[in-house]
């Protein structure tokens, strides 16, 4: 399995209700300290690196064959559209740019444009070591 992009407590899980039940989370929100490093979960090419309403400072990495990872609510983005990144490379810094009450990272995995539960794909460093 892949490593989660940041260490911290998952406060919102895939499929949980939000906005008084009108919407569901398409990813997970990981509480983490402002400025904490955000790591790419896999090798790929940055296809978006900018501010997007609802996501704040967002980076999207295409991993090929329809697989993408999304990293939102960042304080800073360290790679630009078109850049290639390696698994484990620092790509951003945790922030609160997406309008959440706490600092942290919003993280999604998409396959052919459809959100998938990141917890089916990723583990913490502690879980990997066990």
How would you label these PLM feature ranges?
Residues 1-48, 53-55, 60, 110, ...:
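Extracytoplasmic/periplasmic cell wall- or extracellular glycan-interacting regions that localize
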Residues 81-130:
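Conserved, short, structured surface segments that act as functional micro-motifs
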Residues 13, 49-50, 77, 94-97:
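Residue-level recognition of beta-strand microenvironments
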Residues 49, 67-84, 88:
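Short histidine-centered loop motifs in beta-beta connectors
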Residues 42, 63, 73-75, 95, ...:
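Active-site proximal loops enriched in glycine and acidic residues that flank catalytic Cys/His/Asp
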Residues 57-73, 114:
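Short beta-strand-turn/beta-hairpin segments enriched in glycine/proline and small hydrophobics
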Residues 17, 58, 74, 94-100:
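Gly/Ser/Thr-rich beta-alpha loop segments that engage phosphate groups in nucleotides
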């Amino acid at each position: 399995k892949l490593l989660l992009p940041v260490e911290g407590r998952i406060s919102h899980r895939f499929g949980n209700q939000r906005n008084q039940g009108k919407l569901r989370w398409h990813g997970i929100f990981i509480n983490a300290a402002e400025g904490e490093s955000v790591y790419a979960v896999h090798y790929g090419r940055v296809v978006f690196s900018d501010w997007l309403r609802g996501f704040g400072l967002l980076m999207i990495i295409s991993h090929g064959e329809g697989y993408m990872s999304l990293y939102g609510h960042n304080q800073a983005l360290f790679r630009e559209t078109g850049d290639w990144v390696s698994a484990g490379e620092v790509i951003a810094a945790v922030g609160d740019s997406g309008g959440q009450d706490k600092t942290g990272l919003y993280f999604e995995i998409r396959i052919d444009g459809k959100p998938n539960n990141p917890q089916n794909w990723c583990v913490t460093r502690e879980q990997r070591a066990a």
